[in-house]
Amino acid sequence: MKYFGTDGFRGEANVGLTVEHAYKIGRFVGWYYGANRGAKARVIVGKDTRRSSYMFEAALVSGLVASGADAYMLHVIPTPGVAHQTVEGCFDCGIMISASHNPFCDNGIKLVNSDGFKMDEDVLELIEDYIDGKGEVPLATGNHIGATVDYMQGRNRYIASLIASANFSLQGVKIGIDCANGSASSVAKPVFDALGADVRVINAAPDGFNINVDCGSTHMERLQRHVVEQGLDVGFAYDGDADRCLAVDERGRVVDGDQILYVCGVYLNKHGRLSGGTVVPTIASNFGLIKSLELAGLSAVTSGVGDRHVYAKMREGGYSLGGEQTGHTIFGDIERTGDGIMTSLRVMEVIRAERETLSQLTAPCKLLPQAQVAVRVVDKDAALENMGVQNAIAEAEAALAGEGRVLVRKSGTESVIRVLAEAPDQAAADAAMKRIANALEAL
C-alpha cells in the first residue's frame, strides 16, 4: 500500500504525515462507518505524548465530526488501551495517534476495527484512494454533525482491566519501570500500586519531545543501572505507546522478548494453559529460543515479523502465545495485540507463582549470539536487489558455514534495511553483520 505500512500510516510530522492526511482519514472513517450502520458512527481516539499528537488529534477529530461521527477522546493512552476500549465500548473503530518507538519528530495513525484487530487492508485501501482524491464523501450538516466526547473514563476502565487481570499480590516486591516518557507514564504506576508493589519509576515526565529519548525499551541502559543501584527485584521498560515490554532481571541483565516468550510459555504449558503446547515466535527470533522451547517439551511455529503477522499465525493455528524479540508479546486468551503493561503483569505472575527470580527463570533459555543493525537507505527494494548487497549476503552465509544464519529484510515502518546475523560466537555474528551493512552503506 502507498501510505499504510505494517504498523499504520507513519512518517515525519507534517512531512511524510500531515494534518491534511489526518483530516482526510477522519473524514473517510466517519462517513464509512456511518454509512455502513445507517446511523452516526462512534469512533474512539487515543494518542501518545508527542507534541504533534495533539495537532493530529485535532485534525483527525475535525474530520470525524465533519462526516457525522461522534469522536470519543481517550487522550493519552497506550495503543492496546485503544484496542481494548474499542471492543469493551462497542465502538465502530478505534484510532491511535503514535509512532511507537520512533523519535518524537515522527508520528503515525493506526486503526483497529470493532473487534480490536488491526484494520482490514481493504478498508485501508479505500482510505488511501480517498486521500489521493479518488471520490468524495458528503459533509454532515445540521444535527447530523458529530459530537466530541471527553472519554477519560475509557482510560480508567482500561487501567481497571489490567488490575483485574492479576490474581496475585505484589506486596513487598520492588519493581522498576521505565515509561519512555510516553503513553505508559500515567498508566503503569497506578496498576502496580494497586497490586501493592514498591514501584520505582523513571522516565515518566513527558514534555512532547523526550519520548523514547535515551529511554524505554530501545535504550535499556538506564533501567539496568536503576535496578542494580536501587536493589530492585525486577524492572520493566515500555516503548512510546506501551505495546512493547522488555525486562531487566535482578542482576541488571536485559531480558528480551524471546526470553519472555520462553518464561511465559514454559509456565503456561506447565499449568495446561498453552494451546497445543506451542509458542509463535517470528523468523527474526533467536534460534536458541526455538531449541530451548523444544528441550522444554514445547513446539514453535514461526510467523513473519510484526505483531499483525504473529497474531494472524496464532489465530490460524488456535495458539495462545506469540511475540517478537523486540517485546511485542501477545497472550491470545486475553488480548488481540501486544500490551506492554499486560506483559509485565504476566511475567510477575510467573515470578510469584514459581517463587524464582527472573534470572533463574531465564537460565534454561540458551540464546545464540546475535548482531543487528538498521541501515538507512533511499529505496528499500532497490537496496535488496543490488548485486553488491546480494553478494555480501552470500559471502556472509558462506563464512558461517551452516553454523549460523543471516536475515536481511526491509522495515515496514521506516526507510531502513534491517540486518540480523546469528552465530555460535559474537565475533562471527559481528563479522557477518558488518559485511552486509558495509555493502548497504556503500549504496
Where are these regions (language model features)?
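Proline/glycine-rich low-complexity loops and linkers
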Residues: 125-159, 164, 250-323, 330-331
